[in-house]
Amino acid sequence: MIELLSIALKHSNIILNSIFIGAFILNLLFAFTIIFMERRSANSIWAWLLVLVFLPLFGFILYLLLGRQIQRDQIFKIDKEDKKGLELIVDEQLAALKNENFSNSNYQIVKFKEMIQMLLYNNAAFLTTDNDLKVYTDGQEKFDDLIQDIRNATDYIHFQYYIIQNDELGRTILNELGKKAEQGVEVKILYDDMGSRGLRKKGLHPFRNKGGHAEAFFPSKLPLINLRMNNRNHRKIVVIDGQIGYVGGFNVGDEYLGKSKKFGYWRDTHLRIVGDAVNALQLRFILDWNSQATRDHISYDDRYFPDVNSGGTIGVQIASSGPDEEWEQIKYGYLKMISSAKKSIYIQSPYFIPDQAFLDSIKIAALGGVDVNIMIPNKPDHPFVFWATLKNAASLLDAGVKVFHYDNGFLHSKTLVIDDEIASVGTANMDHRSFTLNFEVNAFIYDQQIAKKLKQAFIDDLAVSSELTKARYAKRSLWIKFKEGISQLLSPIL
């Protein structure tokens, strides 16, 4: 009996050793891939190497799920003719900016032509100058208007969200969309497979039965694992009849109406756009939809790109970023805005984990006399991200940056306002995930009134916020310091 046990133990040791050796070899292969085969920052390389070294059995699994980079040419393919048409618009606008004969005399457009040119050149983010914008900071008002616009649709509704919850608000909106589909309106929903995992097929049955079309972005081909879970479509876009567009931070669900016991009031920022910028949102939706739809592709007919007479005069560029792009366009837009600041910078972001160069640009502005204000949440939805955000924001205090914690629920707003003149609102957080891994979309706005409105929203939020002073930060416990340190170490892969 003892001899049998000895043989069994010997065989089990051989099996365990084989598993460890196999895991070690896999980790080496993945380490080799990270260092030599993929384009990454040095910080990201070191973070993944630490994971692979200290988690030899699970490191390669984490890398498969969260670390793999997708080749750009495997994501989106734009027809040559469509690309040629877009390039023609961009070339015309670049020439106009270079010759200083742009048809619109908007002061902001003339002053910030270098930034406009950068977004044009890197992202084909063509400039539109005839827009009218409405700013939302409250979910109830935003969804009331959205539902009314859905009810008024006559031709088509293109509806894209990262999260669509299968709850009261989610079902209400899906029901309204289904009604329009029954009336003969073309209704297409594009949802992220991970973000909307509570919805997926069952929650969409009534909508589809009424004639609506829905597609998942990067759906999992395996029952429990999504090997593309690290690259999610975080965009929120609605286009109605080519006349009205929505873009911003709100997802669809009761949580975003302030009904979550965990988060309470949900503070976010969203835009309703009427004008030619809607065409840019439409183009982004079509590219995303056609990349995922196996059939039922959307054409580039004039029907989807009508002339819009908004009566507005606001300049807007719609910029996208994601792993399919060569440049980190939204990040570059943020950096260009920050470097142009002369008087003030107002930032709201739930996740503030940029790279050191980004942090240095903010420090340089503050040390140069610019009034820099940053607002972050005071409660975590993702603990590691929360502590890394706190440490990064606090690192700016010595440079004179003022940091505020939003105390009235959860802050999810992604806004940047410079000198009461230009602003950005969209889906991109100020972190590595938004800049590099996820698919994002932002509106860059050249208008004093909108910039002042967004700045005033920040100032109004100060009434329900608390300042993070150096003295207050110095009193944090050793346990918090430890959590900050670990989170900071992992921040390149959060």
UniProtKB/Swiss-Prot annotation:
User: Active site located where?
Assistant: H234, K236, D241, H412, K414, D419
Q: Which HAMAP family match?
A: Cardiolipin_synth_Cls (MF_01916)
- Output a single Gene Ontology CC term carried by this record: plasma membrane
Q: Annotated Gene Ontology MF terms? A: cardiolipin synthase activity
- Any one of the GO BP annotations: cardiolipin biosynthetic process
Which domain of life does this protein belong to? Answer: Bacteria
Annotated PLD phosphodiesterase domain residues: 229-256, 407-434
What is the protein named? Cardiolipin synthase 2
The membrane-topology field of this record reads: Multi-pass membrane protein
Question: Which InterPro entries would you find in this protein's record?
Answer: Cardiolipin_synth_Firmi, Cardiolipin_synthase, CLS_N, PLD-like_dom, PLipase_D/transphosphatidylase
